[in-house]
């Protein structure tokens, strides 16, 4: 699904980004162009990947790198926000805390 004003006109930009990693790209179910400036991708219908306006290719590649090395996208993530330069803000779908051991 492709949405957002100007999305069709910017499809080549999106395809260049997605071409950086076919494994992740194949599981992107939606791409939304925000304010005709940056892309927001939906991965496997539940994780949002917000790419920055500047150098989205580098940010997408970083996600792919971390997924390959640490299995980043195997986690139940609600959002990966890459809009802040040199930062990755991850929002969990649910937070599971370990049970308290009363025997200690």
Name the predicted role of every residue range.
Residues 1-104:
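Charged, solvent-exposed interaction patches on well-folded alpha/beta domains
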